[in-house]
Amino acid sequence: MLYYSHGLGEDFLSYGDYYNGHQDDDAITYLTLANKLIHEVNPHAVTIAEEVSGMPGLAVKVADGGYGFDYRMAMNIPDFWIKILKEKKDEDWHPSAIWWETTNRRADEKTISYAESHDQALVGDKTIIFRLIDADMYWHMQADDRHFMVERGLALHKMIRLVTATTINGGYLNFMGNEFGHPEWIDFPREGNGWSYKYARRQWSLVDAPNLKYRFLGDFDREMLALIRSVKDFQALPVQKVWDNDGDQVLAYMRGEYVFVFNFSPAQSFTDYGLLTPPGTYRTVLNTDDPRFGGNGLTDDAIEHLTQYDPLYEKEYKGWLKLYLPARTAMVLKRLPEVRSLSVEQGEMEKRRVRKKRCHAKGKNNVM
């Protein structure tokens, strides 16, 4: 409703496309006044805009020249995931593209990130889990059934949701049942289905069944959200990219004291994969490969990881965090409080050793 054309047949490639006279001033005024009224009547009310053109200022306060919505939906993210699932081989999942899509937003607007919504759950479309596993969901979801397609689907489902949820700058959205990989679509009674109620439901019992794999996804989602909630103002913490490499298919970023590491490669695991992070000791707090979540348990999460000192990055206050990254897994590590940790002591000792060596070499040169 922001445009006389409803945005149909228009490409929004530059800011000039948002201010070319095609905008419906009455509609914009209506939305602005509506937001102003809503927040005056109820200061705790939240308004969210679902808009595809990317109109600037939509989720900016009226006092700051915006339209007054509290959030806008990050509609590019679910479109990206569906596109990559439909068109790309696992070997062609590029972390640089994933990073761009999940963090592509204006700094002054808060967004609601989501991997999928009701659009994918309704009849006629497919949810992420169904695109990953398809009909094998009906035959191989027993907890003790090690079926390749199901194992792949569970692993990627967790990784997709983790990277989407932990790169938010506003909020995270989930459509009921998708968090545990509900196997069927939703179809409300209508003439086309004979007014049937068969698919007008969510089978909540699936996630509670100990003999089925749905509980693995449900448990992971619960732990993931608990981690996010445990960090004060998580959504406001800067998202800082540590590393991405499309060849390795590895992505890493930081928020506060947390490091998020993803290996999207379907076949390549890495030993001692180095990432430059603030020096210290890191402990794994969430791992998609944890057996509790249907993973293979290929890493020992009880191990604390100490960064290695490198004089080249001393001024940047960074050291090498060396990790084992199994294929198609992701982990979250927390930097422990710096109570003169062993890694710090090692770093200081290494610095003194390097300085002593340099002084010794300099003294030799002076003698010569």
Predicted segments — roles?
Residues 1-2:
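Short acidic catalytic loops
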Residues 9-200, 229-274, 278-281, 285-289, ...:
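Conserved alpha/beta catalytic core and glycan-binding cleft of carbohydrate-active enzymes
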Residues 203, 209-231:
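Catalytic cores of secreted or luminal carbohydrate-active enzymes
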Residues 256, 301-340:
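C-terminal beta-strand-rich structural cap/linker in extracellular carbohydrate-active enzymes
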Residues 341-346:
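Polybasic, low-complexity intrinsically disordered segments
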